[in-house]
């Protein structure tokens, strides 16, 4: 996985890096029946009536959500032209990654339409940021209430609005879940028996209230408190995911790119050894310096097939 600090130092040296190959144009029948183009295929699990890869491609790098700083976010947006977004999605499909953690912001809808017009197919697991009327036309496999919006609702005592959103999605015929960055919020939903099908949990607690940070750090003030990643956090989210019988997706398992090389192997191994066989992970790909799609697909394949 790319070390984003090192990348910022070397970006100028790699400015001429180009796209390796054009997108595939053969139209497969569905994400489940696409003919693999690589010997390495990410293992799958059943979810929402389909078979999906346990590694799901994330969308954050596509649209500059670096969770690092404005500079890296800008570099990501400049790199990820519509052509490159589609190429990465096609490459994911060649490695058996057939699910996409989609968010309907900016030009994401146009990029998805282009990918599909080129013959690409992905099961969409949508980050829900609008009403079901904006989600149903996408024909998603599933949708979940966006994690930061869930956390804000919890802090403001408005969890009934999240429950109502889930009900409206259910009434619209959607397979529905709840996302959060805090295991205690997902426990809140689980303990109250909400009518939801699955959970999406950030393994690092990025949305700690200021008062909690003061307790954790003995009153120290932080720069960018929502981008601090504590090593003690992942086991807490993984514990919740093991305990619930519902499918779960873990995200930010690489601490938004802060974990690399051997550390990435360990992070993926920790994730898959800590969650259930019906669970998966969302991981964004930024192949600006190295072939992260291949690296991550091979890593997950190796971990899951040798278990």
Indicate residue ranges for each PLM-predicted region.
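Catalytic domains of carbohydrate-active enzymes, especially glycoside hydrolases
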Residues: 84-103
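Catalytic alpha/beta core domains of metabolic enzymes, predominantly
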Residues: 179-270, 285-289
């Amino acid at each position: 996985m790319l070390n984003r600090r090192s990348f910022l130092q070397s970006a100028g040296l790699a400015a001429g890096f180009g796209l390796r190959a054009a997108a595939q144009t053969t139209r497969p029948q569905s994400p489940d029946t696409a003919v693999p183009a690589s010997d390495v295929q990410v293992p799958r699990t059943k979810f929402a009536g389909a078979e999906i890869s346990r590694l799901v491609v994330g969308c954050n790098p596509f649209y500059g959500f670096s969770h690092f700083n404005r500079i890296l976010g800008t570099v990501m947006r400049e790199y990820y032209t519509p052509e490159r977004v589609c190429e990465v999605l096609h490459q994911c499909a060649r490695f058996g990654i057939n699910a996409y953690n989609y968010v309907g912001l900016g030009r994401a809808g146009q990029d998805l339409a282009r990918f599909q017009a080129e013959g690409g197919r992905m099961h969409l697991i949508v980050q829900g940021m609008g009403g079901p009327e904006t989600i149903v036309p996408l024909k998603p496999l599933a949708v979940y209430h966006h994690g930061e919006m869930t956390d804000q609702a919890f802090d403001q005592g408005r969890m009934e609005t999240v429950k109502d959103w889930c009900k409206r999605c259910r009434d619209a015929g959607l397979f529905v879940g709840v996302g959060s960055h805090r295991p205690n919020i997902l426990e809140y939903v689980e303990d109250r028996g909400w009518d939801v099908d699955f959970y999406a949990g950030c393994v690092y607690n990025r949305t700690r209230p200021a008062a909690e940070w003061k307790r954790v750090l003995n009153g120290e003030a932080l720069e960018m408190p929502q981008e601090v990643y504590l090593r003690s956090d992942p086991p807490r989210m993984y514990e919740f995911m093991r305990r619930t019988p519902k499918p779960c997706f873990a995200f930010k398992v690489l601490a938004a790119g802060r974990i690399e090389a051997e550390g990435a192997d360990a992070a993926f191994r920790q994730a898959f050894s800590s969650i259930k066989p019906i669970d998966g992970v969302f991981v964004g790909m930024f192949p600006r310096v190295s072939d992260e799609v291949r690296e991550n697909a091979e890593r997950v394949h190796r971990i899951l097939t040798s278990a």
